[in-house]
Regions:
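Positively charged n-region of N-terminal signal peptides that target proteins for export
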Residues: 1-4
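Bacterial N-terminal signal peptides
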Residues: 7-17
Length: 189
């Protein structure tokens, strides 16, 4: 009996070591690493979630990375963070730009919107059309700005702490794209 248990244990270890999700967290078949390096900061996975459109259409899955010492209330503060979103459907760059502008407006004051308007236009011009399986990453590093990446390739960086707070508010702010998704990313649900 002992050799059978040993073989089963060894098989489980070997399968786990070759699994694409080893050292990662998976949701809806999409793996996210448990840590992400931003500048000199090791960010830890805070939460992962699935965003549904009209309750039954899977739009995308996301993962939020923050420093371990930062709590959910600091999600929009001047602290390093990274949000990764992997899409299940094709979405045009124009649709991203339109949705980004609207959700930023929903989350910031008219004064803030006026002060970031030019940077928001520049940011929206960075968007590219995505296909199923593509992954955007939004990374903020204080003093360096907010960087948008598509499938690991940098598309550009926009300066300003105010800009970072406004853009991350789309998912993490008081009027997010979806409250359940926000709370899951923040690890409070």
């Amino acid at each position: 009996m002992k050799p059978v248990i040993s073989v089963i244990m060894l098989t489980a270890v070997l399968l786990g070591a070759t699994s694409p999700c080893f050292g990662a967290v998976a949701i809806e078949g999409v793996a996210f690493e448990k840590t992400s390096r931003v500048g000199t900061n090791d960010l830890h996975l805070r939460g992962v979630g699935l965003l549904r459109y009209m309750y039954f259409i899977k739009a995308y899955v996301g993962a939020l990375y923050m420093r371990p010492q930062d709590d959910a209330g600091q999600a929009l503060a001047m602290t390093p963070r990274r949000l990764e979103l992997q899409y299940f459907h094709a979405i045009s760059a124009a649709d991203f730009a339109e949705a980004t502008t609207q959700k930023v407006k929903d989350n910031v004051s008219p004064e803030t919107m006026a002060s970031i308007q030019d940077r928001l236009k520049t940011f929206n011009a960075l968007y590219r059309d995505v296909q199923p399986g593509d992954r955007y990453a939004l990374t903020y590093l204080p003093g360096s700005g907010t960087e948008l990446l598509l499938n690991g390739q940098s598309l550009g960086r926009i300066p300003g702490d105010d800009f970072a707070a406004a853009v991350f508010a789309i998912w993490l702010g008081p009027a997010p794209i979806d409250e359940d998704f926000r709370d899951t990313l923040l690890g409070v649900r």
